[in-house]
Amino acid sequence: MVLMIVSGRSGSGKSVALRALEDMGFYCVDNLPVVLLPDLARSLADRNISAAVSIDVRNMPESPEIFEQAMQNLPECFSPQLLFLDADRNTLIRRYSDTRRLHPLSSKNLSLESAIDEESDLLEPLRSRADLIVDTSEMSVHELAEMLRTRLLGKRERELTMVFESFGFKHGIPIDADYVFDVRFLPNPHWDPKLRPMTGLDKPVAAFLDRHTEVHNFIYQTRSYLELWLPMLETNNRSYLTVAIGCTGGKHRSVYIAEQLADYFRSRGKNVQSRHRTLEKRKS
C-alpha cells in the first residue's frame, strides 16, 4: 500500500492533487499533523487502503527529525512517497491575485512576496527529500490532474516513467527536471523562412535536422548516457526520470530531439511520456 504525502508551496495545486488521488482510490486527508501519520496508517492497514495526506506550512513539524521519526514509525505494509508541487514566484503571486485568498503566512504581517519566500525556506526539508517534484507553472487544473494520474499510477506499480520534456531557455528552465541538455549549438531551422512557422513535430523540420551529423551524434550520445545509468536509477526505488531538452525558443530543435529520444526508449519497452512546454503554452 502507498502513503502519498502531498506538499508544496501554497497556490501550487495541492488541493487539485488531493482530489486527483481521491479519484484514484486513495483515502485522502487534508492538513493532517505529521505526528499523526503513523496512527492514520495503522488504522488503514487492515483495510488494505492506500492513503494520501497533504502537509502545508501550517502543520510542518518544528524540526526535520520529527518528520523522519514519523516515517520510521509507519507500518511496514505502507510505502511512503513524497510528492512536492511548486510553481515559479510570479505564477504564485498571480494565482493569489486572481483568487484574492490570503496566504497562510499572512498572519505574520508579511507581504505576499515575503510570505511566498519564507514558505519556500520552511518547506525546503520536504522538497529536498521529495520523490517527485512537479512544476505546475504552465499547467491548468485539468492538465495537473491528468499528469498526476499518469505518473502516480506508474509509481504505485513501481514502474519507472521516463519523461522527455522540451522547453525554450528564454522561457526559463523547468524546475522539475532531473537532467537538462542544451541543444542551442545545433543547426537552427528558425533561420529558414519556410520552416520558421513550423515545429519540431513537422516532417520538413525533422528532415532538416536529420540531414546534420551533429544532430545524430547528440541523440546517440545522450541516449547512450541515459542507457548507461538507467539500471542504477531503476534500482534506486525511483519511479520517474525527467529529461529536459532546451533550445532557444522551445519550438524546433528541442521538440524534435525530445521526440527522438522518447521514441527510442519507447521502442525498447520503457514507460515513456513526452511533453513540449512551449507548444502547450501556445495552445492555452
From Swiss-Prot:
Keywords: ATP-binding, GTP-binding, Nucleotide-binding, RNA-binding. GTP binds at residues 56-59. ATP binds at residues 8-15. It holds the Pfam family PapZ_C. The keyword GTP-binding applies. Residues 266-284 are annotated as: RNA-binding. Modulates the synthesis of GlmS, by affecting the processing and stability of the regulatory small RNA GlmZ. When glucosamine-6-phosphate (GlcN6P) concentrations are high in the cell, RapZ binds GlmZ and targets it to cleavage by RNase E. Consequently, GlmZ is inactivated and unable to activate GlmS synthesis. Under low GlcN6P concentrations, RapZ is sequestered and inactivated by an other regulatory small RNA, GlmY, preventing GlmZ degradation and leading to synthesis of GlmS. Belongs to the RapZ-like family. RapZ subfamily. PANTHER family: RNASE ADAPTER PROTEIN RAPZ (PTHR30448:SF0). Homotrimer. This is RNase adapter protein RapZ. It comes from Klebsiella pneumoniae subsp. pneumoniae (strain ATCC 700721 / MGH 78578). The gene is rapZ.
